[in-house]
Amino acid sequence: LGAEAVQIGTRFCVAAECICHENYKQKIIKAKDIDSEVTGRSNGHPIRCLRNQMSREYLRLEKEGAGFEELERLTVGSLRNAVIDGDVKNGTVMAGQIAGLIKKEQSCKEIVEEIMEQAEKLMHC
């Protein structure tokens, strides 16, 4: 058994080359390990995001039994609002659990090199 792939989107969101708004990057960099939550479980479209006004409202509506259409209306355009416009309070800030461990912006080259160095160390243990 072994890993065949990894999903590292959150790490690359804060890469120097990434076009994500600086507010989005900083929200991830400042995140703690307990700052993410999963929304969308009730409608079969779960996503992990960082807590903010949008996610709290979404979870409240979900808990109250809101339907797919109502939840969809709330979130239409919200990812763009966060990623492109930088509205990290009312937009959806998608990020994995790893967000709490990301503490700085790096180039893609630095990220890949760091991952490879860590993998090599682990494989030689």
Feature-to-residue mapping (PLM):
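Conserved active-site-proximal phosphate/metal-binding subdomains
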Residues: 1-125
